[in-house]
Amino acid sequence: MSSVDLNADLGEGFGVWALGDDDAMLDIVTSANVACGFHAGDPATLRRVCEAAAARGVRIGAQVSYRDLAGFGRRFIDVSSEDLIADVMYQIGALSALAAAAGSSVSYVKPHGALYNAVVTNRLQAHALAAAVHAVDPALPVLGLAGSVFFGAAEELGLRTVPEAFADRAYRPDGRLVSRRERNSVLHDVDEIAERVISMVSRGRVHAVDGSTIPITVESVCVHGDSPGAVQIATAVRKRLVAEGVTLASFS
């Protein structure tokens, strides 16, 4: 692969509580998955992140979530399709206003946390999520897991789907992410993470937790902004990709 996008979850602080180094990450990534206030992010924080992203030419994506501030959007919620559609439309609309005020726009949509994992297999929520994005703007790409039910629903509506891989998350043999509730679900060794990203991007393969090698399709690589050592990890991944001749460029 000659080029790949590098994305990170940003804007996840709230009030006086900060999470991660948004400014440092924005100097590294090409796309910013900005929280929309449902799992994290107050309006002032989200505005600042949009302004900082716009100043650097980093694409802004709406990272939509269940309405779950207390659980950081990492708890499954059995929400109705009608409510989920409205919630997602609301979040995209709110971030779009902040991005527009910063001289930019929302370029794509990515589900967060438990919603991301749910729409891999949950048909009702996958179709609701896709319907919400389509209702707001049929031209908006969606970021997610290749082969997911969500991608199928999105493609039925004509939405562009962008498969991503996670630099610092462990994979199951079936290609899904290992739950954060399980041991070793998040990787921390910088060199190991950089090497596996090269394998995913250049060779389309990644080692699963059982030791098997599984195929993976990737147009964007996610480096989590809230992980310990996030800036160091993202820097190492970027440097390694560039050293391998891969161009870092947004997909949107």
UniProtKB/Swiss-Prot annotation:
The gene is pxpA. Forms a complex composed of PxpA, PxpB and PxpC. One of its GO terms (molecular function) is ATP binding. It comes from Mycolicibacterium gilvum (strain PYR-GCK) (Mycobacterium gilvum (strain PYR-GCK)). This is 5-oxoprolinase subunit A. It is an enzyme of class 3 (hydrolase). Pfam families: LamB_YcsF. It comes from the Bacteria. The keyword Nucleotide-binding applies.
